């Protein structure tokens, strides 16, 4: 049986998380996150989130692809390429499939305007 360990087995992570308790609570207990979790987020907001998350995931996949190029060992290349594979062939594909059911094709996803918040996050 799986049990929840807020430290993920790391004393350092546990100390960092304890030190950031209030910001962590604001982050993980945000109304948007809560509404996704309990299914009360407005449908339109969820679709908007999926489009923006697609944009984010594309940037994230590119960053990991760059890690493949910059890797110094085969093991590093394998790790980074497996993450690129998971993102591009599974997680992003899920977004494409769900958005297609909403009438949003992948070309539209790929050319979607990036929200300011997303832009700020992906370019920091």
Predicted feature descriptions by range:
Residues 2-33:
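Acidic, low-complexity proline/glycine-rich segments
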Residues 21-26, 40-70:
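Alpha-helical bundle segments that constitute or directly flank the non-heme di-iron/ferroxidase center
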Residues 28-29, 56-63, 90-94, 118-121:
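Amphipathic, well-ordered alpha-helical segments in soluble domains
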Residues 75-124:
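Active-site-proximal alpha-helical scaffolds that flank and shape metal-associated catalytic sites
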């Amino acid at each position: 049986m799986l049990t929840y360990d807020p430290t993920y087995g790391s004393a350092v992570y546990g100390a960092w998380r304890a030190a950031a308790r209030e910001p962590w609570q604001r982050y993980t207990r945000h109304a948007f996150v809560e509404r996704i979790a309990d299914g009360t987020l407005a449908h339109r907001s969820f679709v908007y989130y999926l489009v923006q998350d697609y944009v984010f995931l594309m940037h994230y996949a590119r960053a990991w692809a760059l890690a493949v190029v910059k890797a110094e060992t085969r093991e590093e290349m394998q790790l980074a390429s497996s993450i690129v594979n998971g993102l591009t062939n599974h997680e992003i594909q899920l977004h494409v499939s769900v958005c297609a059911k909403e009438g949003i094709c992948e070309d539209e996803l790929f050319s979607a305007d990036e929200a300011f918040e997303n832009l700020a996050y992906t370019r920091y």
